[in-house]
Amino acid sequence: MAIIDDARKGIITDEMKKISLIEKISPEKVRKRIVEGKIMLIRNEKYPSKKIVAIGKGLTTKVNINIGTSSEVVNLDMELEKVKIANKWGDTLMDLSTGGDLDLIRREIIKHSELPVGTVPVYQVFIESFKHKSGGAYFTEDDLLNTIEKHLKDGVAFMTIHAGLTKDLAIRALKSNRIIPIVSRGGDMIAGWMIHNNSENPYRKNWDYILEMFKQYDAVISLGDALRPGATGDAHDEFQIGELLETARLVKSALEKGVQVMVEGPGHVPLNEIAWDVKLMKKLTGGVPYYVLGPLPIDVGAPYDHIASAIGAAIASASGADLLCYLTPAEHLSLPTVEQVEEGAIAYRIAAHAGDIVKLGKKVRNWDDVVSYYRGKLEWEKMISSLIDPERAMKVYTQFGKPKVRACTMCGGYCPMMWAMEQVRKISD
C-alpha cells in the first residue's frame, strides 16, 4: 500500500518509525506531514534501497549526487566508482546517462547503489528515437510511458517529470530575450517534441496514467523545472514563475491521488533572491519538499561552481529547501571525474549542515558543539574523529609531521587555547 494511504488511515508504518528515530522527530508528526505532502519517503516500494531516505519539513537537508555517462564519455567502471562516492556522502543518486547501453548502465547503478536512485526518463526515449528514427522528437507518447514503466520495474525510486512546461510557455521562452532560453536538457527535449509534433506536453496529456504508474510502485514524482534560469539575469522571470504556477496545480492533483511528489527548483539565482524563492515555492505548493540545483548565485565561477553553489545551497537549506542537488568543479565545463564528484559531494554535505543549523537548531548544532569542545581542549584525536571528513583532516593535521607541542603546526607554542588553559589554572588556584 502507498505510504500516503497508510498515513491517511492513521497507520504508523515501520518506515515512519525508522524515519522518526533517524530524524529525532515524533512518529505522529512524520505520519501527519506525509498526509499533508510535507514529508515524503523516497523509495520504490517493490525495490527498496538499503538506506531509508525521507525529506521534508522538520527533517535534515539531504544531498543528491548526479552521475552518468555522456555521448562523449562512456565508462561504466568510472560511473560505478562514482556510486561508491555517492554511497559515502550522499542521500539520493541520479543516473543522468545519455551514452552507451542505457538499460545496462541504469541497472548496474541501481545494483551497486545503497541510495534511492532517480532518473530522467525523457533522456532515454529521446536518445533512442534519435538512434532508431533519425530524430529525437519522433518518439510517441506510448514510447515515453513505456520507458517510465521500464524504469519503475527496474527499481527507480524517483523521476524528473517535466509536466509543468506547456507548449505556449516553451514557445514564448524560446522567442524571448532571455539570456539563455532553456538550459534544462530534459525540458528542451520536451519543448522540441511539442514543437515538432505541434502537440501539448505528453506528460500533461497522460498525467492521470502517469500518476497510476507511480502509485503502483509508490515511487516519487519530481516535477522538473524546464524553464529554470540558467543565468542569474533570468531568475524569477515570467517563464520560471509561469511554469511554477503550472507545477503547483500538478502537485495538488498528485497528492489527491496519493502519489508522493516534490518540486525541482533553480538553478542560477542571485543571493538576495534565494530565500524568497524557497518561500514562494512553499507557498504556492502547500509546502511539499523542494529539490534545488544549487542554487548558483554567480555565473562566472567555473571551475569552482561547487564552491559558489554551496553558498547558495546553504541559504536555500536554511530557508526551507529539503534536497540539494550538488554541483561539481566540472559544472558547465565537462563530465566530472570521480575526484570531482567527491569534491562536489563534500561541499554540499557542508552546505546542508550549515543550513540545518539555522533550520533545525540545537539538535544538529550539538555536533558542532562537541567538535568545538574538543578543539578548545586540544584533544586532537577526538576532535578529528568527530569532523565531517576525519581521514582527510588527519592527513592535513600531520602534513608537516606530528606537532612538537600540544598545539598544531599553525600556532605551535603560541596557541591561544593552550595558553588559555594554563591561564584558567592560574586564576583558579
UniProtKB/Swiss-Prot annotation:
Transmembrane stretches in the record are: none
Q: Which cofactor(s) are needed, names only?
A: [4Fe-4S] cluster
> Gene3D superfamilies under this entry?
Radical SAM ThiC family, central domain
Checking InterPro entries in the record gives: ThiC, ThiC/Bza_core_dom, ThiC/BzaA/B
Give the enzyme's EC designation.
4.1.99.17
Residues the record lists as binding [4Fe-4S] cluster: C408, C411, C415
Give the residues the record marks as binding Zn(2+): H268, H332
Q: Which GO terms describe its biological process?
A: thiamine biosynthetic process; thiamine diphosphate biosynthetic process
Instruction: Enumerate the PANTHER family for this protein.
Output: PHOSPHOMETHYLPYRIMIDINE SYNTHASE, CHLOROPLASTIC, THIAMINE BIOSYNTHESIS PROTEIN THIC
Tell me its family. Belongs to the ThiC family.
Instruction: State the protein's name.
Output: Phosphomethylpyrimidine synthase
Say which species the protein is native to: Sulfurisphaera tokodaii (strain DSM 16993 / JCM 10545 / NBRC 100140 / 7)
Designated gene of the protein: thiC
